[in-house]
Amino acid sequence: LATRELHGALLEAMASLSERLRLVVTLYYAEDMKMQEIAGVLGVTVGRVSQLHTDALRRLREQLSLDGDYDERQLALLLGRDR
């Protein structure tokens, strides 16, 4: 997908996440917070933040795969962290 199309698909996929999962993704990628900081915000352990982050990314990937082909690197760049 082109970057603009991927961005739109990502926004749609983000809307399908629960508020908590959206918050984890937003804090991690948009606010560039560390998992330990997010744990403090949410009042949970770092391990739980890691689980939520993994779940959110899995759900985003699943949703995006329903929308068509996408490039993992392109997605990482769009989210703001090249992982």
Language-model regions, residue ranges each:
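Short linear sequence elements within intrinsically disordered, low-complexity coil regions
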Residues: 33-34, 75
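Glycine-centered secondary-structure boundary/capping sites
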Residues: 9, 32, 65-68
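DNA-recognition helix of helix-turn-helix
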Residues: 14, 21, 36-66
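C-terminal edge and immediately downstream basic/flexible tail or linker adjoining helix-turn-helix-like DNA-binding
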Residues: 57-83
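Residue-level signal for the short linker/turn that defines the boundary of a DNA-recognition helix
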Residues: 19, 32-33
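Short amphipathic helical patch at the helix-1/turn junction of helix-turn-helix
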Residues: 28-30
